Design a protein with these regions (language model features):
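Active-site cavity-forming subdomains of large catalytic enzyme subunits
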Residues: 118-126, 130, 135-239
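Active-site-surrounding "flap" and adjacent substrate/cofactor-binding loops of secreted or lumenal enzymes
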Residues: 67-113, 128-130, 152, 162-165
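C-terminal motif of bacterial Sec signal peptides marking the signal peptidase cleavage site
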Residues: 15-17
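Accessory "access/gating" subregions that flank catalytic or transport cores
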Residues: 39-42, 174-196, 205-215, 224-229, ...
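Bacterial lipoprotein signal-peptidase II cleavage site
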Residues: 19-26
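Acidic, carboxylate-rich catalytic segments that either coordinate divalent cations
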Residues: 28, 279, 283-317, 322, ...
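Catalytic phosphate/nucleotide-handling subdomain of diverse soluble enzymes
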Residues: 60, 64, 71-92, 231-234, ...
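Mature, well-folded catalytic/scaffold domains that follow N-terminal targeting or propeptide regions
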Residues: 48-52, 178-188, 194-202, 211, ...
Length: 451
């Protein structure tokens, strides 16, 4: 876990314009005033392990959630899926999804965890592959903020054009627009992309929060264009919520996992406009959780409030979309809050609830599996499941034109993420990389400005 040792560093008045190189120590100079600055110290070694945990936790949760993806979406419109799953369905036979042609998942005959052993390889999916691509682009271009051209060129290079390309609806529309020469953020404009309210941006941008530890405002600035590549309005705000959660995961206050998760969630809630349906979904879901009712009852209440009764301005049902908008950002955001609140920071419990909650169940599970996996690291994940896992990842299952025929390792992926974060800490956050102690020093505020 990250250690939050607070270091007080004295800023000295520069008395001359000498060009001496600064020492590799915890000292930085200020030319205007003498004041103490509080720094948060983060071990780069520990952070690399946590990035490994992000990729591993996300992979476990993604593939487990895929077993029940679109099995249960409610009973409105032409497609009806019967009663939602409950905790009693864990370990029982999987039921067919809306596109399963009457057959259960080929990943597992039962609703259960999906693992890859040490001799196997994790496959990429749409919940991991665009994030992998964005990390690759940041690393390759040696930039913290990608340009519209870099995003478009990256998509066109790494996403397959004609065969199965594992893109969801807004991502596919944005990809089509890119082929026509249109650049982000116009690819996510409501005027050009009718799917701007869908879940796609959440699939692709949470990772930016990890590149700006403890600094969600910088993480959001980095993620702004990738988010707007495929989303606007409420879907954009929801994506910013997840980016904020990921950035705040770097703060280890010494509290329990449940306390940390709920504090992070309450802080992230502030990015949602109070009058918006995402904010009201958050408040309603949290209220039901705090009332002590079972998670299934909260999930059912969310379904009736937002899909049946269309309250708080959530009117997806009235649009008569395929599967009643089962892939919309809103209802899946609400479903993700159920597993977040009731999972209480427990990785296995959170994945189980997310898998059973309904709708696009692999997405919330991947989101929280990656978040909690980051918080507890590789060793924490292995301890939770009492086993070892594969460290290999095949990005070419869904994408193309990456090195080594697409076979990567979590060690290499986390090392790249560490280098990307190095640049953000130095250039965007204004922190210090202490080479001798292998630490980041993240500035908080001048001590004399603390209230």
């Amino acid at each position: 876990m990250i250690k939050l040792n607070i270091t007080f560093l004295l800023f000295f008045i520069v008395l001359s314009s000498c060009n001496k190189e600064p020492k590799k120590k915890d000292i930085k100079k200020d030319t205007t005033t003498e004041e103490e600055t509080i720094y948060l110290r983060i071990s780069r070694n520990e952070y690399k392990d946590q990035l490994y945990g992000f990729w591993l936790g996300q992979s476990i949760a993604n593939w487990t959630g895929l077993v029940t993806e679109m099995d249960k979406i409610g009973n409105i419109g032409d497609i009806k899926t019967g009663e939602f799953y409950t905790r009693e369905d864990w370990g029982k036979p999987d039921q067919p999804s809306i596109w399963g042609e009457g057959l259960p998942s080929d990943l597992s005959p039962d609703i259960n965890f999906v693992f890859k052993g040490v001799d196997e390889i994790w496959g990429a999916d749409d919940d991991t592959d665009i994030e992998y691509m964005y990390q690759h682009l940041l690393y390759r271009h040696k930039k913290s903020i990608l340009t519209p051209e870099q995003i478009r060129n990256g998509w066109l290079q790494h996403i397959k054009l004609e065969e199965e390309n594992y893109l969801w609806v807004s991502n596919q529309k944005a990809f089509d627009l890119m082929q026509e020469g249109i650049l982000p953020p116009k690819t996510g404009s409501p005027k050009l992309n009718e799917h701007f309210e869908m879940i796609d941006a959440q699939l692709t941008t949470e990772i930016f929060g990890l590149f700006a530890p403890t600094k969600p405002e910088i993480a959001i600035r980095m993620a702004q264009l990738p988010i707007q590549t495929v989303a606007r309005n409420d879907a954009e705000d929801i994506s910013k919520f997840y980016v904020t959660m990921y950035s705040l995961a770097s703060i280890n206050s010494g509290k329990t996992m449940s306390q940390r998760i709920h504090k992070m969630a309450n802080t992230s809630r502030k990015v949602l406009p109070d009058s918006s349906y995402p904010a009201q979904m958050f408040d309603y879901s949290q209220k039901l959780y705090m009332s002590g009712i079972p998670w299934e009852q909260t999930r059912d209440s969310i379904y009736y409030k937002y899909q049946v009764n269309q309250e708080n301005g959530y009117n997806i049902t009235s649009k008569n979309l395929y599967c009643n908008g089962c892939f919309a950002s809103g209802i899946n955001f609400a479903a993700s809050l159920v597993s977040l609140f009731y999972g209480e920071g427990d990785l296995k419990k959170t994945i189980k609830i997310g898998t059973l909650a309904g709708w696009d169940s692999d997405n919330p599970t991947a989101t929280w599996g990656g978040l909690i996996g980051f918080m507890i690291g590789k060793d924490g994940i292995e301890a939770a499941f009492d086993r070892k896992f594969s460290n290999r990842f095949n990005i070419h299952r869904t994408r193309q034109n990456f090195p080594n025929d697409g076979i990567d390792t979590f060690e290499n992926m986390s090392q790249k993420g560490l280098i990307v974060t190095d640049r953000v800490v130095k250039e965007e956050i204004g922190g210090i990389i202490d080479i001798e102690e292998n630490m980041w020093l993240i500035p908080i505020k001048p001590r004399n400005n603390q209230k």
